A protein has these predicted regions:
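C-terminal cap/substrate-recognition subdomain and adjoining C-terminal extension
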Residues: 22-177
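Substrate-recognition element of Asp-dependent hydrolases with the DxDx(T/V) motif
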Residues: 1-27, 43
């Protein structure tokens, strides 16, 4: 995380409920580092799609609309000027591609979920694939172009996705094409 805090403005946006986030934060940032995050958003700042996950039918799909971040929908929690962040300089990282259904395609990456213990998993390490990818992101002015040219993790959900017929219903529900 130090690598990220040194190079980026970092926020945490979880689809978990607010009262469950503190334990996750301690694991991710280390004890006492919450203040280094520009914002911490929970399920309340997500959009409830009204649909459920294909893999876990009891789990609702919550969407993370980057427009809410860029437009400062929740201004009290965002310490920057309106318009300072946009599609060109924002990257959403989430293990669930469906959270980004309403965002521009190349505005997010979706690493595989971490499965412990796996001593051969170096994805998050100092020489890992994510670190290398983020080093590239830190050097560019146009994040979506970099994401498009340097695919990493799971593919985004687009019309070529095998489950598109299901996810298309969510997209249309919110008036996107």
């Amino acid at each position: 995380m130090k690598f990220c805090f040194d190079r980026f403005v970092v926020g945490l946006w979880s689809s978990a409920r607010d009262h469950n986030i503190d334990a996750v934060l301690s694991c991710i940032t280390g004890h006492g580092n919450r203040h280094k995050l520009a914002f911490v958003w929970a399920q309340e700042e997500c959009e409830d799609s009204g649909f459920y996950c294909l893999e876990k039918e009891e789990k609702p799909i919550f969407l993370k609309r980057l427009e809410d971040l860029w437009g400062k929908k929740y201004p009290i929690t965002l310490p920057w000027k309106n318009g300072q962040y946009s599609a060109s300089n924002t990257l959403l990282i989430d293990t669930e591609p469906h959270v980004s259904l309403l965002n521009p395609v190349d505005s997010a990456i979706f690493p595989q979920p971490y499965k412990k213990p796996n001593p051969r998993d170096t994805f998050l390490g100092q020489t890992g694939e994510l670190r290398s990818f983020l080093e590239g992101v830190a050097e560019v002015d146009d994040v979506p172009t970099y994401v498009k040219e340097n695919r990493i993790g799971q593919p985004p959900i687009t019309p070529s996705h095998p489950d598109w017929k299901y996810y298309e219903k969510i997209v249309h529900h919110f008036g996107k094409k």
